[in-house]
């Protein structure tokens, strides 16, 4: 279990809720929706399209056979870790009006989130920034909304001291900007006019083609 997923479960348990897990070693979307019906689950935690696509396929199959799953108890689906595409979010919302919470972060710190509903249509890789988060260009400029530049996302607040016995990686990731200590896990983004960001992906996974940078989220969105 990841630290982030553990935090979600701990929060529910501390509030008097119940944490429900699957006994299956693999992921079975039909089994998940059956369990949601049986237990009247309110919150579902997933990891992007890797889970959401088969979940949507299962809902579509059930609807096509006039045996739709009962989703009336579901209030929110929470995702983090990999891309959750606009197409799949819209598909889920057709079956049930709920909140789709897409969170962006890493072990080094939380950065942003987005919430989609039928009245607030989703956008792929669009996030509102958490307080204390900046986007900084490679030349050190702190970007403002509407900038044409692309920058690294940095988060302040509860920033780790460093990586154990890895001074080089620690110096690359944890830096001070104007006297404030930030964590820069390596994610690039563009800061839009409205103050939201479009996440482009991890710089270490970027592909250079004919002088242009192609980011992971751009490739995944096309696929």
Regions found by a protein language model. Give the residues of each.
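Short, intrinsically disordered, charge-balanced linker/junction segments flanking boundaries
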Residues: 1-5, 220-223
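Short hydrophobic "strand-cap" motifs at the C-terminus of beta-strands
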Residues: 6, 22, 47-48, 79-80, ...
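Gly/Ser/Thr-rich phosphate-binding loop
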Residues: 14-17, 41-46, 56-122, 128, ...
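Short Gly/Pro-enriched turn/cap motifs at secondary-structure boundaries
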Residues: 122-128, 173, 179-180
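Conserved beta-loop-beta connector loops within the AMP-binding
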Residues: 134-155, 173, 190-194
């Amino acid at each position: 279990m990841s630290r982030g997923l553990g935090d979600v479960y701990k929060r529910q348990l501390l509030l008097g809720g119940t944490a429900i897990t699957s006994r299956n070693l693999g992921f079975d979307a039909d089994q998940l929706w059956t369990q949601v019906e049986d237990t009247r689950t309110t919150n579902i935690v997933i990891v992007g399209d890797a889970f959401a696509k088969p979940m949507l396929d299962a809902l579509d199959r059930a609807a096509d056979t006039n045996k739709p799953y009962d989703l009336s108890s579901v209030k929110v689906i929470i995702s983090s870790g990999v891309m959750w595409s606009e197409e799949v979010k819209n598909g889920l919302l057709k079956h049930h009006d709920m909140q789709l919470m897409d969170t962006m972060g890493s072990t080094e710190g939380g950065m942003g989130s987005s919430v989609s509903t039928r009245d607030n249509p989703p956008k792929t890789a669009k996030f509102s920034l958490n307080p204390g988060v900046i986007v900084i260009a490679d030349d050190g400029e702190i970007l403002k909304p509407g900038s044409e530049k692309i920058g690294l996302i940095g988060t302040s607040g509860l920033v780790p001291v460093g990586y154990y016995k890895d001074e080089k990686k620690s110096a690359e990731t944890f830096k001070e900007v104007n006297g404030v200590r930030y964590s820069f896990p390596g994610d690039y983004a563009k800061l839009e006019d409205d103050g939201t960001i479009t996440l482009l992906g991890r710089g270490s996974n970027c592909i250079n083609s004919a002088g242009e940078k192609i980011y992971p989220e751009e490739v995944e969105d096309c696929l």
